[in-house]
Amino acid sequence: MTPPSYLETNEAIFYEKIFNEFGKTQKEVEQYVDILRKWSEKQSHWPEMPTLNGLLYCILVSKFSIENAKKRTDMYYTIKGLMPEIFTVHPSSPEVIKHSEIAYCVPIPKPTKSHERIFYVQLNPDYNPEDFKIELFFIQITHMVEVIIQEDKCYNFHIIFNASGIKIGHLARTHPMVLKKMSICFEMKVSRNSDVLFEAFDKSLLPTDIGGEGLSLKELRLLLLKEFERMTPRFDRLQTMRTDESLRPAELQNDDTLGYYGNFKKLDLD
């Protein structure tokens, strides 16, 4: 039997949060997931049937839009063939293990009181800028996201980027457009010290490296590496996971009367 993930969740709080934010009960959430599951069964070009947690994740980040959830789920598989240089790199490969020490990129095991996941990112000041590889950093992120999709019960996230380890050489190795895209994709707040973090998050969650009372970055890194090891069968499978475009169904057509395909499936609600 596969041991559970080290990411802590509370399903009661999880579904309470969904109800407060979207007005959906657990039963309704399960019905949405079932709609997406039944549609997924017809996608013969996919290399596998998505996990229920993966379908749930797509539903939540799509804010219960079935149409958008379909697109996200399909892209999850399609992108692996479009970017093989990213998705064929195993988290247990020596280069990734080494780079995880150069650039810390870790989820905090315990969620916040409002059941949101914190990701902590920091460059290790013990390494030189030339040791940092932006491609491997992005690969680290995809590995972490895979863990979240398959194992987590959080759908709101906070990314803490500690810039204390950044040197001039790092900036020279990062294209300005990458920084611009980051500012567009994420709502960013900048602070000169960690005091603002202690105001926003429980001190027990944050790494000891910045004065928190949680685990150290080294300990968090080792936990994530163990999680990758636990999920070895999954990451082994991802190495060759590709869509068969010759089997892709015709693109879904929206109906003038019914609207987006699948968005208005009847839900059995009490």
Regions found by a protein language model. Name each.
Residues 1-270:
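Basic, amphipathic alpha-helical/coil surface patches used to engage anionic, phosphate-bearing ligands
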